Amino acid sequence: FISTIYIGGGTPSAIKPELIKKILDKIYDVAGIEIEKNNGTSNGGKKVIGNEMPDKKEKIEITIEVNPGTTTKNNLQMYKNCGINRLSIGLQSTDDDILKKIGRIHNYEQFLDTYKWAEEAGFENINVDLMLGLPGQDIGILKNSLENVVNLKPEPKHISVYSLIVEENTKIEQRINSGELSLPDDEEERRQYHYMKNFLELNGYKHYEISNFAKLGFESKHNMNCWEQKQYVGFGVAAHSYVNGVRYANTTCLLYTSPSQRDRQKYS
């Protein structure tokens, strides 16, 4: 049976929510999943009612990643109505200057709007993404971001904190190479990591995985499935799968209409 569905990116919130619904409806139909909608109706599936897995007092976790710069109140309500019950919001920092430096299309105020709309739409399980090692970010700026996030009302149930990875041939790489931007050195990033870890643990978040912290009972099932080497199937460009002990990666080329059938890389 399916225990989790994760709609990641890229930026899923950049496409029309009707397309997200179409994808989910196809999964529900093929897997026989019945999702109870906010209005009390269902999609006519067979196996799962109210997002609950058969024969288990446990709900299917259905997550979507959203960018505050491409998210509307209406979109969030549509996500909720089609069965999504977990939201991951890509904030990265509450410092607007830092957000500009890394090319984010949103500011902190837009994040606050997104968070408020998510609560109004009925989302209780919300993750907030932050980042370490950002250009111009020191422990003082990181501390301010952490304080702002843990003091949100209601508090986020999950916080992820990742290190910045500079990809080749990107604008940020060009700006770093030209000397326009500079990154914290490894020692500074380590200090930021340990400061962040201690801060979140003191604020009641369990450090259950390298970059992830959760309130009790809100650990990401998707993350845990990956760490526990459970099987998962990825669909779409650059999606990864893990089946029968073998990891697969779909092509990153957008020219192929069937990326799962072309240039798939296999990892033993």
Annotate the PLM regions.
Residues 1-39, 56-258, 262, 268:
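C-terminal scaffold of the Radical SAM
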